[in-house]
UniProtKB/Swiss-Prot annotation:
CDD domains: CARD
Gene: QRICH1
Induction info: Regulated at the translational level via an alternative ribosome re-initiation mechanism in response to various stress such as endoplasmic reticulum stress or oxidative stress. In the absence of stress, ribosomes re-initiate translation at an inhibitory upstream open reading frames (uORFs) of the QRICH1 transcript, which preclude QRICH1 translation. In response to stress and subsequent EIF2S1/eIF-2-alpha phosphorylation, ribosomes bypass the inhibitory uORFs and re-initiate translation at the QRICH1 coding sequence. Positive autoregulation at the transcriptional level.
One GO molecular-function entry: DNA binding
Record comment regarding domains: The CARD domain may be involved in the regulation of caspase activity in the context of programmed cell death.
Protein name from the UniProt record: Transcriptional regulator QRICH1
Length: 776
């Protein structure tokens, strides 16, 4: 396409515009020529900048052509569907020897009801001399509306025992009676269209291996094209490029072209060195594409040897219905792969047939809105890496999604073993259900498959029930569980009472109140005990221990919020409940998935602060808080370790900031593993475990709570070296100077407190980090 800016812009701006059309691999040559030749370099690069090129990178020859997209240089290629099929009579062979002959035939048949265009290229390559390439265009129809020109172009030929088989591109669309012009066809006269392309190419290698390339692509216009009177015009060659829905003309590199309306498709293939000159490109020179169509997903595959493969998946759509367009480009590095299989479609269909009749598209379930499949099999010398041949290695796959304004469809990427012959999938295998709204990236190496599911960016991901972890307590959930259990239990009691004789004295049947607030202490204690064993979720399954503990914390918060002062975890009236709960929680270990991931607990530290199980609300709560901090920071995980803790072994230390003497920091320290240190050994700072201040929240500061605990303890026990946790007084006033007796708590009581602490998520994480650091 001629540049129309030469006479309207400055020379420097013209150079910048011209540089954007120079391919990246020729940019250095362009700059050197510009410095030496001056304006003559612009004329030299004027013709080569917009033509297709083949250059070598690594072991492959890359087919490239410059394309200007929204004012920047971008090599844009959209995939077409490919699959491997046996050779048919319609496919024409290409024998590689040093003579080469290429014939391209274009036939367009037209009737008042249907217009079909069939392009059937045959490539025959022999390796000794030069023969011309013939391009024949034949147009047949019931009305004299087209012509059939013929073009001959020179071509180089080269010998080889290889053979390229194939290529058949069929383009069909149904429309009302109209004329087909060699220049363009208005889209408003074509409500529906269908494109079916097949490209098969094969080459017999030295070892007898046969590799074939076949492409099949089908596309249909969005509904906006069907209903609007003027949506624009498009022109397309045999390998065409996605363009926005607006009127545009594109110059073809050859003089004879035909135009159809619809959504074209282009592909980029890796061409072997021996066939660089035998590839004929019919792609338009220049196009303009809406830059709003960006990427949808990127897959990165890293092999055990450190090789990284990046699989960018580009999804581009016109300004039509986003649900009716899905075009994908898969780019694979050239170094370490042999075959790539790409398929994507929102509905199920194997043989792609898009009927342009409105009624058929609405009424026929076998018609798809968009379906494509692509197999790109390289013929280069570098095959699949040797470490992937056995198919028994692990391939980590990372998928990153970028939200877009379109609806994603299922996409699958298969990387096959080079020794395996690709097989065409059945309709059920290659297309997921229409309701599926996920992208799947599946990498297969012989016997091993790694699959990563990516949720559609438009919809919020629905995590599994195991990952629905609450961040705070919800009292209504605890009340709901209690009501459901009470209703079930009351029904069981009534059923049992009907089967038994009435007791002497006509005692009233036991019934549990569904309202927690009106329940008596004894009834609530008994009901909570039974709930530890009988509570069930909506599916009739028993709750996990940490979930059950979470429910009881919700009940505790509900009681506090509604005026009840009962502490079901520390009051003497609920001792039986705490014993039953201890039996449920004592054997709890962090749950690990089959892949080795640790599932976090439902209970968090924040939840205990919410329901007043941590803090200085009561003597029992303060004692539990100190045990929590000692477990979290001193990493005391067993009852024996806590029993060894003593007032004399916990040191309070204050440090001054050297730069600012008024800035002081206070901490409490505990000598770790006191028994393993030898007598007379010098004690260093790394031998101590430390708890530091929390100046942001004094009510949750370990140092201030420790000082408050010392303040409430009897003076006679503050220097003891055999105890740290004292027994709370049963009844005390908040302003009482003494909250604890001189007796230490029992081992059983300490075990129950520690069991509930070890279920907390932050405690489990701290222990896991400490264990991981000791292993290293």
């Amino acid at each position: 396409m001629n540049n129309s800016l030469e006479n309207t812009i400055s020379f420097e701006e013209y150079i910048r515009v011209k540089a954007r059309s120079v391919p990246q691999h020729r940019m250095k040559e362009f700059l050197d020529s510009l410095a030496s030749k001056g304006p003559e370099a612009l004329q030299e690069f004027q013709q080569t900048a917009t033509t297709t090129m083949v250059y070598q990178q690594g072991g492959n020859c890359i087919y490239t052509d410059s394309t200007e997209v929204a004012g920047s240089l971008l090599e844009l290629a959209c995939p077409v569907t490919t699959s491997v099929q046996p050779q048919t009579q319609q496919e024409q062979q290409i024998q590689v020897q040093q003579p080469q002959q290429v014939q391209v035939q274009v036939q367009v048949q037209q009737s008042p009801q249907q217009v079909s265009a069939q392009l059937s290229p045959q490539l025959t390559v022999h390796q000794p001399t030069e023969q011309p390439i013939q391009v024949q265009v034949q147009i047949q129809g019931q009305a004299p509306q087209s012509a059939a020109p013929s073009i001959q172009t020179p071509s180089l030929q080269s010998p080889s025992p290889s053979q390229l088989q194939a290529a058949q591109i069929q383009v069909q669309h149904v429309q009302a009676a109209q004329q087909i012009q060699a220049a363009e066809i208005p889209e408003e006269h074509i409500p529906h269209q269908q494109i079916q392309a097949q490209l098969v190419a094969g080459q017999s290698l030295a070892g007898g291996q046969q590799i074939q390339i076949q492409t099949v692509g089908a596309l249909s216009p969005p509904p906006s094209q069907q209903g609007s009177p003027r949506e624009g015009e498009r022109r397309v060659g045999t390998a065409s490029v996605l363009q926005p829905v607006k009127k545009r003309k594109v110059d073809m590199p050859i003089t004879v072209s035909y135009a159809i309306s619809g959504q074209p498709v282009a592909t980029v293939l890796a061409i072997p060195q021996g066939q660089q000159q035998s590839y004929v490109s019919l792609r338009p020179d220049l196009l303009t594409v809406d830059s709003a169509h960006l990427y949808s997903a990127t897959g990165t595959i890293t092999s055990p040897t450190g090789e990284t493969w990046t699989i960018p998946v580009y999804s581009a759509q016109p300004r039509g219905d986003p649900q009716q367009q899905s075009i994908t480009h898969i780019a694979i590095p050239q170094e370490a792969y042999n075959a790539v299989h790409v398929s994507g479609s929102p509905t199920a269909l194997a043989a792609v047939k898009l009927e342009d009749d409105k009624e058929k598209m609405v009424g026929t379930t076998s018609v798809v809105k968009n379906s494509h499949e692509e197999v790109v099999q390289t013929l280069a010398n570098s095959l699949f890496p040797a470490q992937f041949m056995n198919g028994n290695i692990h391939i980590p796959v990372a998928v990153q999604a970028v939200a877009g304004t379109y609806q994603n469809t299922a996409q699958t990427v298969h990387i096959w073993d080079p020794q395996q012959q690709p097989q065409q999938q059945t309709p059920q295998e290659q297309t997921p259900p229409p309701q599926q709204q996920q992208q799947q990236l599946q990498v297969t190496c012989s016997a091993q498959t790694v699959q990563v599911a990516e949720v559609e960016p438009q919809s919020q991901p629905q995590p599994s029930p195991e990952l629905l972890l609450p961040n705070s307590l919800k009292p209504e959930e605890g009340l709901e569980v209690w009501k459901n259990w009470a209703q079930t239990k009351n029904a069981e009691l009534e059923k049992d009472a009907q089967n038994r004789l009435a007791p002497i004295g006509r005692r009233q049947l036991l019934r549990f109140q569904e309202d927690l607030i009106s329940s008596a202490v004894a009834e609530l204690n008994y009901g909570l005990c039974l709930m530890t064993r009988e509570a069930r979720n909506g599916e009739g399954e028993p709750y996990d221990p940490d979930v059950l503990y979470y429910i009881f914390l919700c009940i505790q918060k509900y009681l506090f919020e509604n005026g009840r002062v009962d502490d079901i975890f520390s009051d003497l009236y609920y001792v039986r409940f705490t014993e039953w709960l201890h039996e449920v929680l004592k054997d709890v270990q962090p749950r690990v998935t089959p892949l080795g991931y640790v599932l976090p607990s439902h209970v968090t530290e924040e939840m205990l602060w919410e329901c007043k199980q941590l803090g200085a609300h009561s003597p029992s709560t303060l004692l539990t808080t100190l045990m929590f901090f000692n477990t979290k920071y001193f990493l005391l995980k067993t009852v024996d370790q806590h029993m060894k803790l003593a007032f004399s072994k916990v040191l309070r230390q204050t440090k001054k900031n050297p730069s600012n003497p008024k800035d002081k920091s206070t901490s409490i320290r505990y000598l770790k593993a006191l028994g393993i240190h030898q007598t007379g050994q010098k004690v260093t700072d790394d031998m101590y475990a430390e708890q530091t201040e929390n100046p942001e929240n004094p009510l949750r500061c370990p140092i201030k709570l420790y000082d408050f605990y010392l303040f409430k303890c009897p003076q006679s026990v503050k220097g003891r070296n055999d105890t740290f946790y004292l027994t709370p007084e049963p009844v005390v006033a908040p302003n009482s100077p003494i909250w604890y007796s001189v007796q230490p708590i029992s081992r059983e009581q300490m075990g129950q407190m520690l069991t509930r602490i070890l279920v907390i998520r932050e405690i489990q994480e701290a222990i896991a980090v400490a264990n991981a650091s000791t292993m290293h």
